[in-house]
A protein has these predicted regions:
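N-terminally biased helix-coil "hinge/interface" segments that flank
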Residues: 3-173
Length: 173
């Protein structure tokens, strides 16, 4: 600020009154992700789809190096839990959200003392009803725990991208 006011030949009060925004960039978020210092996050997915983070759409950093280990997912497998529900690709409900299945998952996350929960159900970008219901239940049963749903964070068709973006969003809260 001082350098810029000197360059313009005005005082700081005048400079700030004419300033629309001040942007400050850091690597704090990037460092937190790389060093895995984010929030302890749980993931709720459609039953049978908790490993999408490890499958990564089959992509590898070096596709021809079979010995190159993939980086560990931001959410360990024991904190990735399946919930019985299913939305079809066209947005129609195939299987209603099973509250018993959801309650079991919530109890496990409570036991593990997670500080945030990501919810990413199949095809929620088309029909977010189950994710929205899950968010309301989580907020009631796990007060103080941050909750993000993929249909709000990144409502796009690709499952891996929705899951990973929602998790990164929560990891940095």
């Amino acid at each position: 600020v001082y350098k810029r006011q000197d360059e313009l030949g005005i005082n700081s009060e005048t400079l700030l009154s004419k300033t629309e925004s001040i942007v400050h960039g850091t690597t704090v978020a990037t460092n937190a992700l790389l060093e895995r210092k984010g929030a302890k996050t749980g993931l709720l997915t459609t039953l049978g789809h908790r490993d999408v983070l490890e499958m990564r759409e089959g992509l590898k950093d070096d596709r021809y190096n079979m010995r190159l280990p993939a980086p560990a997912p931001l959410v360990p497998r024991f904190l990735r839990l399946g919930v019985r529900e299913r939305i079809k690709p066209d947005g129609r409900i195939h299987t209603e959200l099973d509250n018993t299945s959801l309650d079991e998952a919530i109890n496990k996350l409570r036991e593990e003392k997670v500080t945030s929960v990501a919810v990413c159900y199949l095809h929620a970008y088309k029909e977010p009803k189950h994710e929205q219901e899950t968010k309301q239940i989580l907020e009631a049963k796990l007060p103080g725990v941050s909750v993000s749903i993929s249909s709000e964070v990144f409502p796009e068709i690709k499952e891996y991208e929705r899951v990973s973006t929602t998790i990164v969003n929560l990891s940095l809260i």
